[in-house]
């Protein structure tokens, strides 16, 4: 009798595990459908098919807290804790298109957040490229590392640092993506951008503008406004508040 009870228990656990696996598979299928609908809606913001395909491959629900799961595929910013947000998908797509990311690029991101933006950029730079993403809030840096690892992104390095100074350790960069608003374009970031490189950065306090910065082969800087935006403020030496 004890042996039979043991067998029944094992079977019960197996059935429970199978049920859990089924629920996970169903959730992934549903998320895939929602992601497809989301990306279809982005076609009014973005025309680069490579960017749209990258957005389609990244499971956004794996990069948001449990309490935001229901809104993972709504085109809106979501809170991720510590006064920070994950950008709306259309903004992520627009910034990636502005950056003109390509296979093999080395990219610096200021503001890792949950790791979602880095994951999308990772898809665009491929296995020969690399994303270095800087996050000043330790719990968020750990959250981003966990999310990226579980989602299988191996060409992304999360660095616990204050990003207002950039990250000279791996400079110069082909591209720089800044996901927090600065009072102006930090000179130190311009110095870390390769000749021929592109940076995208929101500039301003309450009324912000997204700026595309291009450094030509001679080092000359060109700036172009790409629209009004709202981002959390940059904190640090070149931000709105020093720490």
UniProtKB/Swiss-Prot annotation:
Major enzyme class: transferase
Similarity comment: family membership: Belongs to the methyltransferase superfamily. L-isoaspartyl/D-aspartyl protein methyltransferase family.
EC number, UniProt record: 2.1.1.77
Cited NCBIfam families: pimt, PRK00312.1, PRK13942.1
CDD domains hit by this protein: AdoMet_MTases
SUPFAM superfamilies linked: S-adenosyl-L-methionine-dependent methyltransferases (SSF53335)
The keyword Cytoplasm belongs to this UniProt entry's keyword annotation: yes
Entry function: Catalyzes the methyl esterification of L-isoaspartyl residues in peptides and proteins that result from spontaneous decomposition of normal L-aspartyl and L-asparaginyl residues. It plays a role in the repair and/or degradation of damaged proteins.
InterPro entries (UniProt xref): PCMT (IPR000682), SAM-dependent_MTases_sf (IPR029063)
Catalytic site positions: 87
Record-linked PANTHER family: PROTEIN-L-ISOASPARTATE O-METHYLTRANSFERASE (PTHR11579), PROTEIN-L-ISOASPARTATE(D-ASPARTATE) O-METHYLTRANSFERASE (PTHR11579:SF0)
GO cellular component: cytoplasm
Lineage, uppermost ranks: Archaea, Methanobacteriati, Methanobacteriota, Stenosarchaea group, Methanomicrobia
PROSITE patterns on file: PCMT
Reactions accelerated catalytically: [protein]-L-isoaspartate + S-adenosyl-L-methionine = [protein]-L-isoaspartate alpha-methyl ester + S-adenosyl-L-homocysteine
Record bears the keyword Cytoplasm: yes
Keyword annotations of the record: Cytoplasm, Methyltransferase, S-adenosyl-L-methionine, Transferase
A GO biological process held by the record: methylation
Protein name, as recorded: Protein-L-isoaspartate O-methyltransferase
Places the protein is found: Cytoplasm
One of the record's GO molecular function terms: protein-L-isoaspartate (D-aspartate) O-methyltransferase activity
């Amino acid at each position: 009798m004890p042996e039979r009870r043991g067998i029944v228990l094992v079977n019960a656990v197996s059935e429970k595990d199978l049920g859990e696996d089924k629920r996970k598979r169903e959730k992934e299928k549903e998320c895939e459908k929602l992601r497809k609908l989301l990306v279809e809606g982005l076609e009014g913001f973005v025309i680069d098919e490579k960017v749209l395909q990258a957005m389609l491959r990244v499971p956004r629900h794996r990069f948001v807290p449990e309490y935001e799961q229901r809104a993972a595929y709504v085109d809106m910013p979501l809170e991720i804790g510590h006064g920070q947000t994950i950008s709306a998908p259309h903004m992520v797509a627009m910034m990636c298109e502005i950056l003109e990311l390509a296979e093999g690029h080395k990219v610096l991101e200021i503001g890792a957040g949950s790791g979602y933006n880095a994951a999308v950029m990772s898809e665009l730079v491929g296995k020969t490229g690399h994303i270095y993403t800087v996050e000043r809030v330790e719990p968020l840096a750990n959250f981003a590392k966990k999310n990226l690892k579980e989602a299988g992104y191996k060409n992304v390095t999360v660095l616990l640092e204050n990003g207002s100074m950039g990250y000279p350790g791996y400079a110069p960069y082909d591209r720089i993506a800044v996901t927090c608003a600065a009072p102006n374009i930090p000179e130190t970031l311009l110095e870390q951008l390769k000749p021929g490189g592109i940076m995208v950065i929101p500039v301003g306090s309450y009324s912000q503008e997204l700026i595309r910065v291009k450094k030509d082969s001679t080092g000359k800087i060109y700036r172009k406004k790409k629209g009004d935006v709202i981002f959390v403020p940059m904190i640090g030496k070149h931000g709105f508040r020093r720490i």
